[in-house]
Amino acid sequence: MDELMAKAKGIVLDVEHSATKDGPGIRTVVFLKGCPLRCIWCHNPESWSFRPETVDDTVHGGKKTYGKERTVADVLEEVLRDKPFYDASGGGLTLSGGEPLAQVRFASALLRAAKDAGVHTAVETCGHLPRTVIEDVRPNVDLWLYDIKGMDGELHRKHTGVDNALIHANLRYLDEQGAKIVLRCPMIPKLNDSDENLAKLAALADALKGVFRIDIEPYSPFGVDKGQQLGLAVYEAPLPPPEYAEGIIRRLSALTRKKVAKGDL
């Protein structure tokens, strides 16, 4: 890794070690701050802003800061401490957020450095990015965890703040380039779980040869308290029972040739 890459800086929200639900094997997940979407059900609203934010810690008292400026070299050193676990389990590094590729200079440098160190890489993305960003990082990404939050463009705009045309265009581009893709689909009761949405989602997945699994992520109210701390309005609804996700998986599995599994929002 050259000196310029090593010194590239980004705003890191958190680093999770020993993760098992964000790609294969045991993984280290680096969460970057900043996102172009404003999903009303977001469980990480503290990831929206690109700047560190300090709030009152209503659980432990005092203050809590979301986000810290770090260099690629610093984060890579932390990631590589877990390399024996990656090697033993087929794991690696996952970038998440927020939208990790919105900090493209930092994300690109970290992904390239991880690949140079022999680490498997995955990126969770909303896909609402300039094509040039996708093109820049694609050679250093082994697996894409691609968020599909709804198939209807107008409803997508209502629920996330943006249309889904660019998201779908970038997804098709990645598929054309031979990318390995898992579709990650939050399911929010009465908002995006209609028969029509599931049918269109199944058709999309079946049309993309690189998609090998669809993960269903049922609604969680995890972001409500964090949103209140930050003065942000986050959609609040009851936690759906376990059979809700099971029902979505059954309905979608009947419509698609791809594997459908339960993920976690």
Feature-to-residue mapping (PLM):
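N-terminal [4Fe-4S]-dependent radical SAM core
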Residues: 1-70, 81-89
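Short glycine-enriched, charge-decorated loop/helix-capping segments at active-site entrances
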Residues: 48, 64, 157-163, 230-238
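A general alpha-helical scaffold signature found inside nucleotide-binding enzyme cores
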Residues: 70, 162-169, 243, 247
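Conserved AdoMet/S-adenosylmethionine-binding subsite of the radical SAM
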Residues: 76, 80-229
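Auxiliary Fe-S-binding modules of radical SAM enzymes
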Residues: 1-24, 189-265
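Residue-level detector of family-conserved "landmark" positions at structurally sensitive sites
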Residues: 49-52, 124, 184, 216, ...
